[in-house]
């Protein structure tokens, strides 16, 4: 069975891992880094992903970051260079890049992946992630919750222990808390809670707002209206946040940030950890609520938790670590790398699927309650949150009016009592209900949640046995035709990227050859026929013309032709050198027979030694 890679598709950074020799191994990107910025940039039709895209964010307005925050969002698109892209398509570009360098590392084609999502992602967001994988040319074998994947990586070598662990996962854009019970190779999720709009980006934004306010106070200029300045502020804020995890004070220096009437202006500021903690105290406070909720849902006290695992780069913030310490009365476990552990867990789950990892069972839960809208706009739950998946549940409903010919099934996800306050997953209709007084028809509504947390709903008239089934497609969901088109676009982009690389390699080859030719012709001056030199010079000029005309086919032909001429000239040069040496030293040319000593070799046996 082919390898299944594990992908942590993050808000700010992504990572890819694979199972080798029973152990999960992170695959480094072409720059040698173990995580890749989840950034995509567009320039003159060329798509770039990762480090190179992030580096040009200041100067290139067509750079997209943190697209994960918009996954599953109805109608959301980004317009770049005259084209519109859905969050699924942008995410697919990141996945395609990760897939590409994973293939280079493995030396084989990769077609299957396990992709992680925040535990608190709803159905629409999970479906969008699966679609992104499909567009990138990946068969998504499983969608795994990030904290669960982290627990899998942490606990794989501890299957003989019985432990209750709390995973605190604060990433770039999302926050999850999951509580799991580990024992005999079973990873049983007891509860999960979270906030899909809380992450490292929010901590950065607090620093940005502070810098903008201070600069305005000093200079009367609002940097919030200057796109290029804002991007520089974002980079500086991220760096300052990271610095303050290790030191208590950091200097922010941004020369020529903007210009005033008197000339250029610079931003110079000292930010202390105490000030940073003050600016972000409300965010740290927000992390405590899901911790308490998860403990309550699991029916546990903090004292019953054996280990606290920190996941996500934002858990390096000292105030966050302190908050976790206080809430759980535990020293967080530092044995896992918060940036890599999720991708490693995904790779392990891939190994479970292929059978390479044995005696491990993963029991995950649905993060939000599921149900339908009933009379009076009430949300009637069929499946409660934190129910182990896969699962299914049925309930019988009836009509609200006499002779009602059809019922509308409005499927929702959430925790609020009224339907309007919850997230709509989809709507469908069961028609041709025979005329009968209200309350007589028996309509059975069944919910089915698969192992990826994706929902199927069925409505059946028990009188006529007529039924209607729907796989939930949210308002942001893509049709099969749309996905097919996007897959073709993604393949075309990959082909275009490959062609572009070949063109660059060809141009580099040609440039190197021109340099070699000039050097060789200089060495051959006066040593070979002028006609031979002229032939080489003509071929060189023809190659230069092909490069200037950007004619790929001509470039290939002229390069090969010039290469042949240069090789012939080089051979002649060596022949001449050999002749010259022979003339200068005739004895050496004759083989120098007198200087050669004949040697007799005799085999020595152990006895003769």
From Swiss-Prot:
Residues making up the signal peptide according to the UniProt record: none
InterPro entries, alphabetized: ATPase_NBD, Chaperone_DnaK, Heat_shock_70_CS, HSP70_C_sf, HSP70_peptide-bd_sf, Hsp_70_fam
UniProt keyword terms in alphabetical order: ATP-binding, Chaperone, Nucleotide-binding, Phosphoprotein, Stress response
Residues with Phosphothreonine modification: 174
Region (Disordered): 577-609
Regions of compositional bias (Acidic residues) in chain numbering: 595-609
GO molecular function: ATP binding; ATP-dependent protein folding chaperone; unfolded protein binding
Keyword Nucleotide-binding applies: yes
One Pfam family of this chain: HSP70
PANTHER family xref list: HEAT SHOCK PROTEIN 70KDA
Family stated for the protein in its record: Belongs to the heat shock protein 70 family.
Identification of the protein by name: Chaperone protein DnaK
Organism: Enterococcus faecalis (strain ATCC 700802 / V583)
């Amino acid at each position: 069975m082919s390898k299944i890679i594990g992908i942590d598709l993050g808000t700010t950074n992504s990572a890819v891992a694979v199972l080798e020799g029973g152990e999960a191994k992170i695959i480094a990107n072409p720059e040698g880094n173990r995580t890749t910025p989840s950034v995509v940039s567009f320039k003159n039709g060329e798509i770039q992903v990762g480090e190179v895209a992030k580096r040009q964010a200041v100067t290139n307005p067509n750079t997209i970051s943190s697209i994960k925050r918009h996954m599953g969002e109805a109608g959301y698109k980004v317009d770049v260079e005259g084209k519109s892209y859905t969050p699924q398509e942008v995410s697919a570009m990141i996945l395609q890049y990760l897939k590409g360098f994973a293939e280079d590392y493995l030396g084989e084609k990769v077609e299957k992946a396990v992709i992680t999502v925040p535990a608190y992602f709803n159905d629409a967001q999970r479906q969008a992630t699966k679609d992104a994988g499909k567009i990138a040319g990946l068969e998504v074998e499983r969608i795994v919750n990030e904290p669960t994947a982290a627990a899998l990586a942490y606990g794989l070598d501890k299957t003989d222990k019985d432990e209750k662990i709390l995973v605190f996962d604060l990433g770039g854009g999302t926050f999850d808390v999951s509580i799991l019970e580990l024992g005999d190779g079973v990873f049983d999720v007891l509860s999960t809670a979270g906030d899909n709009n809380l992450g490292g980006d929010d901590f950065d934004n607090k620093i940005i707002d502070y810098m903008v306010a201070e600069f305005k106070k000093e200079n009367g200029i609002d940097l919030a209206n200057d796109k290029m300045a804002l991007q520089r502020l974002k980079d500086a804020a991220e760096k300052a946040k990271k610095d303050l995890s290790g030191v208590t004070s950091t200097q922010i220096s941004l020369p020529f940030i903007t210009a005033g009437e008197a000339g250029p202006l610079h931003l110079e500021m000292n930010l202390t950890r105490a000030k940073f903690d003050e600016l972000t105290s409300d965010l740290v406070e927000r992390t405590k609520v899901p911790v308490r909720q998860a403990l309550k849902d699991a029916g546990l006290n903090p004292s019953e938790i054996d280990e606290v695992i920190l996941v996500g780069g934002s858990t390096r913030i000292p105030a966050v670590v302190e908050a976790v310490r206080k809430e759980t009365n535990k020293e967080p476990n530092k044995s896992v790398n918060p940036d890599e552990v999720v991708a490693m867990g995904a790779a392990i789950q891939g190994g479970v699927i292929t059978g390479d990892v044995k005696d491990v069972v993963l029991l995950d839960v649905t993060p939000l309650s599921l149900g339908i809208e009933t009379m009076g706009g009430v949300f009637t739950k069929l499946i409660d949150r934190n129910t182990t998946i896969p699962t299914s549940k049925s309930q019988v409903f009836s009509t609200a009016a006499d002779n009602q010919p059809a019922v509308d099934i409005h499927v929702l996800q959430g925790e609020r009592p009224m339907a309007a306050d919850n997230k709509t997953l989809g709507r469908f209709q069961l028609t041709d209900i025979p005329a009968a007084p209200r309350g007589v028809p028996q309509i059975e509504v069944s919910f089915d949640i698969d192992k990826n947390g994706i929902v199927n709903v069925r409505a059946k008239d028990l009188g006529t046995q007529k039924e209607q089934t729907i796989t939930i497609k949210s308002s942001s969901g893509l049709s099969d035709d749309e996905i097919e088109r996007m897959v073709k676009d993604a393949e075309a982009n990959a082909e275009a990227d490959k062609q572009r690389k070949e063109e660059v390699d060809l141009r580099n080859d040609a440039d190197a050859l021109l340099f070699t030719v000039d050097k060789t012709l200089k060495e051959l001056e006066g040593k070979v026929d002028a006609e031979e030199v002229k032939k080489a010079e003509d071929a060189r000029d023809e190659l230069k013309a092909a490069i200037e005309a950007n004619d790929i086919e001509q470039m290939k032909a002229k390069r090969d032709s010039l290469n042949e001429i240069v090789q012939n000239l080089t051979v002649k040069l060596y022949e001449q050198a050999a002749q010259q040496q022979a003339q200068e030293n005739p004895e050496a040319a004759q083989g120098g027979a007198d200087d050669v000593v004949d040697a007799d070799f005799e085999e020595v046996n152990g006895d003769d030694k």
